[in-house]
Amino acid sequence: VAALLLRETLETPGKAGALVTPEAQLARRVAAILERWSLDIAPSSGTPLTRCQIGAFLLLLCRWVRDPAEPVSLLAVLKHQFASIGRNPDHLHKLVSEIERESLRGPRRHSTLEDLADRLENPRNDNEDEERKRKPRPHCAALIRDIDKLHYPARAAFFDDQIDGKAAAEAIARLAEAIAGGPHIWAGKPGAQAAQFITQLGELSDAMGLMDSADFADFAETVMQRMIAAPDTAEHPRIAIWGPLEARLQRRDR
């Protein structure tokens, strides 16, 4: 209802309106509905970093890094909007679709990324695949080998059961840049907050000493859950989503 009322306000020339609510969850729901109508209205309170693309990407990498060949997390990384791996989006999407169809559905048959690349390049017709001969897919194998190379520098930080959390946080930041193809992921207010997250994660980890590598991803998520990214878009001239404090300082028609 709130989203409809805000949209209705725009249909009256010169009118302005605002949703005033102390509930961050309600503000996010209304903003999501408005976005479906191409109205980018971010709550003035900001957005949890975990709900931002860069935040979700970093947490995904924290879980993927320990077992990069795990099918579900590997696909999530390859399909993420930040992933480029040196290819244009259309080409990458085509290759990822082929890899998913040929090798990542059903039971896991590979142990490592190199094993997966080898199976794509030199298909093995398992018993259940006798009716459908698999074709060599060298371009798909090349993509897997490329992401394996990008992942390689981060392995040292997560190799042992007990790891240096600060080194692990820095490794995740470098891995994110490598997969995305540059430092542009830190752009804007969400990117700046994500960079602050890496710094804070490193400092907290350093204070704790060594930690179990299996616990790092959960710890990273706990740290990120407390962080809010400020709105990265200019305020709409006629409609807004405010908290009670902002509402006391401004007025709208509705």
Question: Where do the model's predicted regions map?
Answer:
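Polyanion-engaging groove/track-forming segments
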Residues: 1-254
